């Protein structure tokens, strides 16, 4: 079963790492959509998994923006 990264694991990453993961996931989603359009797709479930992972990353970034959650670097500053 294809599973994405749990939100708890994403919350442990720095903002730069999250942005990098987001970029990589978007590239993968683009490639998967291209494979789907050309009929080369083997695992249709992977599309959904990658979309959900992108949503999780956006959620973690938004939580930090609103101050609902703090990143791993913020605890060291106190």
UniProtKB/Swiss-Prot annotation:
Gene3D superfamilies: 1.10.287.310
GO MF term set: structural constituent of ribosome
Keywords associated with the record: Ribonucleoprotein, Ribosomal protein
Gene Ontology biological-process annotations: translation
SUPFAM superfamilies: Ribosomal protein L29 (L29p)
Any single GO CC term annotated in Swiss-Prot or TrEMBL for this entry: cytosolic large ribosomal subunit
Pfam families (alphabetical): Ribosomal_L29 (PF00831)
HAMAP family per record: Ribosomal_uL29
Similarity field: Belongs to the universal ribosomal protein uL29 family.
Protein name: Large ribosomal subunit protein uL29
Organism listed in the record: Rhodococcus erythropolis (strain PR4 / NBRC 100887)
